[in-house]
């Protein structure tokens, strides 16, 4: 080989190596746009394909949204002989929502049952018309703010004289659109956590919740946004700008008001404070004040004991025998941890539509690969605090359900679902350390492989599973 030819060959090889090394970086930069391109058709298909009211508590969430759309911003305890046993809370909503959901009730918790044309035909004849006191105790305490996409869709549906079913699909699409846009912002802001935020937003469980009529869609997406903003500030090791502090304040307040166990996210600004933390403390105090105000108000006017729970008895028992919490926690985790993992990845419907084992394990590996990408960069000022927040938040989830959903003296904590830990996962990711320098260039490639796995298999597996579960049988 003559010298000019040899030089061209070396240059070509060098260019190819640089191109390959830069591919993961280019893919990472394009993640926000790629997520939109991936999520829009998938979420719209999922919102249409999932039968009406076959997301967790979707009937009660929709009753709450209709109540807000009618001008009642807060739920309240219902009084009178009809609400004595069991006690309930709710407000004025449309009984047509219950009528429209009844034809699909036979499918809930019954994987052998499929929906039929007659179910849709009966339900589609119901429009908005009534306004009466209805109980929806498990959603009556929720604030109105995160129901805004559904409320807007209900206003449009009522103005256009749509049926309740058509308006429900519109509400799902509105919720999904809002959640995917917020998630895209979160991916755009994130530095270290960009891979894992994208992976969490693509999980089957997250996607299903994004296109439900519940507030979970915005709880998850707003948490991703808070983590993305905190991640960027911490990675760049600079003070937070005023608009960033405002965004964190608003988002974290809405998250904690909607689900008090996530109130610990209010502490995240302290994980990135540099020098004097006066401004960050101010943000934290403001967030905690908003959460406390709504929690006290909603507990006073709308909270009722459910599922045989009695918080007073439970608290007295804890004070009397605090060390009994250790075996209760141990039994709960050993009994249900595998279920929590499956539900975190995705058990659809009313926890009655499981996904194949190979896919659940593959998605778990893909999620772990996305976490490795976090280790390609150095962490922010106080990564340990993010871990403390995630652990405290997880404990708060168990504690809240032990008090409000578990029967007194029960040996296990009842009512915990894997999806409750999705908002805490990106917080935990902030705590991961940087990997040794020699391995860092490989990590983005592993994360990219995980994202590609999710992008290919999540739509294929989820759509096929829903089609066979609800329509085709088997």
Predicted regions and their residues:
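Transmembrane-helix signature of polytopic, membrane-embedded enzymes
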Residues: 160-165, 184-207
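Membrane-interface helix-loop-helix junctions at transmembrane boundaries of multi-pass membrane enzymes
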Residues: 29, 241, 277-281, 372-392
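Start-transfer (signal-anchor) and selected internal transmembrane alpha helices
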Residues: 1-44, 281-287, 378, 386, ...
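Short acidic/glycine- and proline-prone juxtamembrane loop motifs at membrane-interface regions
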Residues: 212-219
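Transmembrane helical bundles and short interhelical boundary loops of multi-pass, membrane-embedded
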Residues: 293-295, 302-318, 416, 441-474
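Perimembrane helix-loop-helix junctions
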Residues: 229-246, 263-291
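Interfacial juxtamembrane loops and adjacent helix segments
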Residues: 72-170
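Membrane-lumen/periplasm interface segments of multi-pass, membrane-embedded glycan/lipid transferases
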Residues: 285, 298-377
């Amino acid at each position: 080989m003559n010298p000019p030819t040899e030089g061209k060959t070396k240059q070509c090889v060098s260019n190819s190596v640089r191109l390959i090394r830069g591919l993961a970086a280019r893919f990472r930069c394009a993640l926000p746009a790629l997520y939109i391109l991936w999520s829009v058709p998938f979420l719209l298909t999922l919102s249409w394909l999932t039968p009406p009211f076959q997301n967790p508590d979707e009937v009660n969430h929709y009753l709450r949204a209709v109540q807000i759309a009618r001008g009642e911003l807060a739920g309240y305890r219902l009084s009178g002989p009809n609400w004595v046993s069991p006690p309930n809370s709710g407000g004025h909503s449309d009984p047509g929502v219950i009528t429209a959901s009844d034809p699909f009730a036979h499918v809930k918790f019954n994987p052998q049952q499929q929906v039929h044309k007659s179910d849709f035909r009966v339900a589609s004849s119901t429009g908005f018309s009534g306004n009466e006191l209805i109980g929806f105790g498990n959603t009556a305490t929720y604030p109105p703010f995160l129901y805004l996409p559904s409320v807007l869709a209900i206003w449009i549906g009522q103005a256009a004289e749509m049926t309740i079913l058509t308006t429900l699909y519109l509400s799902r699409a509105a919720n999904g659109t809002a959640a995917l846009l917020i998630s895209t912002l979160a991916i755009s802001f994130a530095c270290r956590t960009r891979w894992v935020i994208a992976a969490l937003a693509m999980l089957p469980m997250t996607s299903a919740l994004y296109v439900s009529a519940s507030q979970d869609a915005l709880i998850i997406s707003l948490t991703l946004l808070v983590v993305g903003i905190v991640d960027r500030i911490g990675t760049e090791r600079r003070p937070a700008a005023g608009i960033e502090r405002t965004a964190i304040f608003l988002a974290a307040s809405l998250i904690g008001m909607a689900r008090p166990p996530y109130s610990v996210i209010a502490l995240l600004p302290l994980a990135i404070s540099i020098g004097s933390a006066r401004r960050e403390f101010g943000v934290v105090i403001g967030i905690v004040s908003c959460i406390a105000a709504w929690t006290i108000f909603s507990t006073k006017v709308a909270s009722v004991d459910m599922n045989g729970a009695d918080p007073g008895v439970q608290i007295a028992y804890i004070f009397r025998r605090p060390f009994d919490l250790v075996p209760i926690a141990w039994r709960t985790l050993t009994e249900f941890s595998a279920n929590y993992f499956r539900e975190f990845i995705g058990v659809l419907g009313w926890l009655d539509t499981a996904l194949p084992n190979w896919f659940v394990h593959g998605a778990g590996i893909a999620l772990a690969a996305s976490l490795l990408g976090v280790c390609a960069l150095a962490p922010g000022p106080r990564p340990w605090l993010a871990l403390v927040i995630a652990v405290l938040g997880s404990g708060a989830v168990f504690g809240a359900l032990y008090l409000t959903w578990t029967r007194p003296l029960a040996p296990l904590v009842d009512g915990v679902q894997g999806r409750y830990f999705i908002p805490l996962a990106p917080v935990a990711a902030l705590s991961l350390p940087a990997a040794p320098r020699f391995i860092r260039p490989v990590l983005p490639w592993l994360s990219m492989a995980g994202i590609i796995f999710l992008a290919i298999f999540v739509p294929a597996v989820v759509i096929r599973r829903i089609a066979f579960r609800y329509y085709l049988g088997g």
